[in-house]
């Protein structure tokens, strides 16, 4: 695990009255501890996975769906991409004692936070990717808050699976700067859209369990705007 970009920004969260970890882009974190994992998202996506029986969970934060990268690429670079970030999170939870068949997912982000982003909507691509990846992996999404135009601050309690989300003002300076850099990266030198690559995932024969009727996602902070979208049962 030494080569993987595990989040290291530990702090005490005064709002939740517990220790926490702030995840930056390209990072992940897994734990059984009763703590809070926090990240801020624009077009990026965070997947929060939880084993309700093992009471273990984790979060990742990826910037682009997949680049079809060389497997020998550095782990810190590969974590930018959803396929690798999801694989790392799942595998690390299993190594720590989680059971894949019990995993539940809550997913956030994928906003279109830059005005005029009509030809390359990174947020839509990320949201579409994480839904397809989890469907192929037979991991149910119990709740989601994806797309739209607002950046988000997400808090996840990996011990209980509780998640909370806060919508931020559209042009949050740090998020806007990061989004501009992502937009440049998503376009090749000739100004054409980078090709989309299907995630390298495995299929499993066991049918996915149905999603819960109500997502365990709440709002926090004074500027919260709306709850996460409820997942409908098939």
UniProtKB/Swiss-Prot annotation:
Could you tell me which Pfam families the record lists for this protein?
Answer: CheD
Keyword list (alphabetical) reads: Chemotaxis, Hydrolase
Q: Which GO terms describe its molecular function?
A: protein-glutamine glutaminase activity
EC number annotated for this UniProt entry: 3.5.1.44
Q: Which reaction does it catalyse?
A: L-glutaminyl-[protein] + H2O = L-glutamyl-[protein] + NH4(+)
Q: Does the keyword Membrane apply?
A: no
Q: Which domain of life is it from?
A: Bacteria
Q: Which GO terms describe its biological process?
A: chemotaxis
**What does this chain do?**
Probably deamidates glutamine residues to glutamate on methyl-accepting chemotaxis receptors (MCPs), playing an important role in chemotaxis.
Q: Which PANTHER family match?
A: CHEMORECEPTOR GLUTAMINE DEAMIDASE CHED-RELATED (PTHR35147:SF2)
Indicate the family of this protein: Belongs to the CheD family.
Protein's name in the database: Probable chemoreceptor glutamine deamidase CheD
């Amino acid at each position: 695990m030494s080569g993987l970009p595990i989040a290291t920004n530990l702090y005490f969260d005064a709002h939740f009255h517990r220790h926490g970890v702030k995840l930056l882009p390209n990072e992940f974190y897994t734990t059984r501890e009763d703590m809070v994992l926090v990240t801020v998202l624009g077009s990026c996506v965070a997947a929060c996975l939880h084993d309700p029986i093992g009471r273990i969970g984790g979060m990742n934060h990826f910037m682009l769906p997949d680049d079809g990268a060389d497997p020998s690429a550095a782990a810190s670079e590969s974590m930018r991409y959803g396929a690798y970030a999801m694989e790392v999170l799942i595998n690390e939870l299993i190594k720590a004692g989680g059971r894949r068949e019990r995993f539940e997912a809550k997913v956030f982000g994928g906003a279109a936070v830059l005005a005029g982003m009509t030809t390359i909507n990174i947020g839509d691509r990320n949201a579409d990717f994480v839904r397809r990846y989890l469907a192929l992996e037979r991991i149910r999404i119990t709740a989601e808050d994806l797309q739209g135009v607002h950046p988000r601050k997400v808090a996840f309690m990996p011990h209980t699976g509780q998640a909370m989300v806060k919508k931020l003002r559209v042009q949050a300076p740090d998020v806007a700067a990061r989004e501009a850099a992502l937009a440049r990266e998503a376009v090749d030198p000739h100004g054409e859209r980078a090709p989309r690559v299907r995630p390298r995932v495995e299929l499993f024969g066991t049918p996915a369990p149905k999603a819960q009727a109500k997502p365990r996602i709440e709002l926090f902070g004074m500027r919260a705007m709306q709850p996460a979208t409820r997942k409908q049962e098939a």
